Amino acid sequence: MKLKKLIITLGLGACILMTGCGSSSSTAQSGGADTSSKASASAEGADIQKIKDKGVLKVGVKVDVPKFGYKNPDTGEIEGFEVDLSKQIAKKILGDENKIELQGVTAKTRGPLLDNGEIDMVAATFTITDERKKSYNFSDPYLTDGVGLLVKKDAGYTSLKDLNGKTIGVAQSSTTKKALEEEAANQGISLKFSEFGSYPEIKAALDSKRVDCFAVDASILNGYVDDNSVILDDRYNPQEYGIASKLDNKELAKVINEVVNDMKTSGEMDKLIEKWGIK
């Protein structure tokens, strides 16, 4: 009897040990899978994983710049060169160019919307400057432009010097005002400025003669020129456009830059520029 009891006791002990080991192994496997999953997400970048979890890339674009980012009044859709460019980034991250959410921005609102996380990136005629690089990651440039001047044909202006003492309409928080102030100082002339919240407002001010000139990057002006206005030949302060993202979203910035450079190398960027008639 004692021998039987001893055998049963030993058997139970072995079962308990086996169960314990099995449980421990299962937990270890589960923990290993968990760790592996976390390591994978970490390797990819938490910022990219966050976009994948949302299932959509949120992008700030212009809605008042024909050819770049413009809300089509007939369809209600936002379309343009920078919209198409952003779709390629969505495709790279999410595998589908349509997994994109577009948010209209202006020169004044694009920074704050990026700062508070309402959008993941900005593709909105955003000029790269050393000062802005302190606040945001910028991709390599995808387009180079310069400040142009749109005036009424009947005004007779042919150069910036002709606008001495006149009022220039510019967008709020843009680099245009500073560029023209520096050029005016170089030429020994004086300019006055009136700032507006959107480009259509500046064009309306030009048409109603509240300003004498509409100044912004020349490629943007191309979308506003009409039979009664003309863009002067001179260009000031050559500047480059880049896609901006938050400084701590380093993996996103890396992916954005890869797409931009791949498109430049393959010729796709030039095809997009040609498609939208950007000069």
Where do the language-model regions lie?
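Extracytoplasmic small-molecule ligand-binding "clamshell" domains
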Residues: G32-D34, K38-G45, Q49-V122
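Acidic, polar ligand-binding/catalytic clefts
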Residues: K87, K99-K161, S229-V230, R235
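C-terminal motif of bacterial Sec signal peptides marking the signal peptidase cleavage site
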Residues: L17-G20
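A ligand-binding cleft/hinge motif common to bilobed small-molecule-binding domains
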Residues: T109, T125-S135, A179-A184, K203-P238
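Periplasmic-binding protein-like
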Residues: V63, L143-V151, A218-N261, K279
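Extended ligand-binding regions for polar small-molecule ligands
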Residues: G22, G32, A39-A41, V83-L85, ...
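Ligand-binding cleft/hinge of the Venus flytrap
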Residues: D74-T75, K87-N98, T176-E195, I278
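Short loop->beta-strand "edge-of-pocket" segments that line small-molecule binding or catalytic clefts
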Residues: L57-V61, E79, K161-T176
